[in-house]
Amino acid sequence: GQRAIGALSDVVSQYQINEDYSQIALNGEPMKVATLEYAGFFKWFNNRKNGIPGYVLVDAVKFEADYVKLDKPIKYTESGWFNDNLERHLRFKYPTAIFEGYYFEVDEEGNPYYICPTMTAKIGLFGGYDVNGVVICNPCTGECKKYSLDEVPQWVDRVYDGDLIETKYNWHGMLADGFINSIIGQKDCKKTTADYGYKVIDNDVWIYTGVTSVIDDSSNIGFVMVNARTGKATYFNV
């Protein structure tokens, strides 16, 4: 990604690439996308009227990166200050919402958006949280819209974070046969492996991770695939 903007002196001197790339499916192809960010407070101060001019799109198969210049620059971003800060902008609009994160994506036409899942407490005893909706923010205009989980547009790829998916499966794997069994005996208790990956199927991003026994985690006993937009999970035995 850095190479893609390296030849653009006016860009590389004022902005840096957000290293937290988002895995997306763009017209059926696996891609990674990241916005540019201001390289510090003074870079923001000097460029705040111009905004952020574009983003970087990486082909995950060919390992080729392209810089995409926008017709309308990005105003609201994580590296912005004061009223240009994305989190501050969302807090003003949704003061009671609990945001899980802010994920940069583009739709099928290449228009940029931040996907911002909202959370609610589901398990009081354990302090568990789960996604209950999504706010989609246009970072160029600041326009935001809140969606319930069954209303999320098809082009959105990431509503459920991989870490949250692993946590949710571990709740299921440990507690399916009861809380007492999860502490004493741990019969049939399962947990996910320490890492996860992404796969694009039918223009959706799926998160996959291995599953092991709590008692013996030396080998996988199966794996689980979860749709990162809908949360639909499928378990496969090995």
What are these regions (language model features)?
Residues G1-V238:
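Soluble extracytoplasmic regions of secretory-pathway and membrane proteins
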